[in-house]
């Protein structure tokens, strides 16, 4: 019988305060998180952002105990899935591949090769597909597979997304129902779905299906819930000056409060494990915001973690994937290429394309010089008294 492995993919998170800065550097070094026209800028910009943000981020992690519980929860999920599969008659080895912190995806692949796995199911712990979550991990795996002859011997299949799985939806409905039942006025509770946001350009220009899958998921949950409570979908955790999917969670909370909502139940729709965005951003920041805005009762649905209905459904999903035709990384990477076409000789401003390329390069050099001067406090702008 073939040796079967299950590779669970997730984001990763700093386990202690000292991990925060390198974790942020890894995160912002990913071109799917911050997309730049020049790849050589990725690492310097990641260093700059992680240097500027890590102290604030450390403060946030202090508020939830000094580190992320994501690794330990993912390990619990892996064990629960393995036990469920064993009950269904399938013996497997479980592996965890985090994108930005230990155990890194590369570490998981080293174990997979060492333990001579012959069949591998790759399961992202993101219900909805996005080029910045599952897609980023799939592209990394694709690159690693291409240059490793040992990996090429492994028969693998990829599960791109599973946002409409019946067990996932049912588990979410059960958790929402439990919270509604604890409210003194369950019919008056406004159900507030909060998903991690992505830049609008990912959806409109790169063809990311994330927003559509989130909306489909919310619609399916509400239909299964079969209640008359009003509901809202909003997006949290945006970074940087570009436009992200709207409405933003903080704006939507204030708008609902201004409209007279007093009971709010927040449902973290794109997260299956407790981590910084549920424990700190929702439980602390958004709770304070809601109370200041006039919301009297703020509730939050817990993350799925090892909910038995959810775990059983993931085990079924693995079994189905093994029986179905295999899907490779190219099938799973759902991103269309957008190519902006310009005249070959001149752009609309009358400049040659070569001149525009050099203008762009010089602009980026100037940008990096400005960043360096802001960080060090030395340079021509300081000398001239402009900074």
UniProtKB/Swiss-Prot annotation:
**Main location group:** cytoplasm
Locate the residues binding Fe cation. Answer: 196, 277
Q: Which CDD domains does this chain map to?
A: Ferrochelatase_C (cd00419), Ferrochelatase_N (cd03411)
- Tell me which InterPro entries the record gives: Ferrochelatase, Ferrochelatase_AS, Ferrochelatase_C, Ferrochelatase_N
Q: Which reaction does it catalyse?
A: heme b + 2 H(+) = protoporphyrin IX + Fe(2+)
Record GO terms (molecular function) = ferrochelatase activity; metal ion binding
Q: Which UniProt keywords apply?
A: Cytoplasm, Heme biosynthesis, Iron, Lyase, Metal-binding, Porphyrin biosynthesis
One GO BP on record is: heme biosynthetic process
Can you quote a single GO CC term? cytoplasm
Per its UniProt entry, what is the enzyme's top EC class, as one word?
A: lyase
Q: Which SUPFAM superfamilies match?
A: Chelatase, Chlorophyll a-b binding protein
Q: Which top-level group of life is the source organism from?
A: Bacteria
Q: Subcellular localization, per the record?
A: Cytoplasm
Q: Name one Pfam family in it.
A: Ferrochelatase
Q: Which pathway does UniProt place it in?
A: Porphyrin-containing compound metabolism; protoheme biosynthesis; protoheme from protoporphyrin-IX: step 1/1
The Enzyme Commission number assigned here is 4.98.1.1
Family label: Belongs to the ferrochelatase family.
Q: Which HAMAP family match?
A: Ferrochelatase
Q: What does this protein do?
A: Catalyzes the ferrous insertion into protoporphyrin IX.
Q: Which PANTHER family match?
A: FERROCHELATASE (PTHR11108), FERROCHELATASE, MITOCHONDRIAL (PTHR11108:SF1)
The name this protein carries in UniProt is Ferrochelatase
Species of provenance: Trichodesmium erythraeum (strain IMS101)
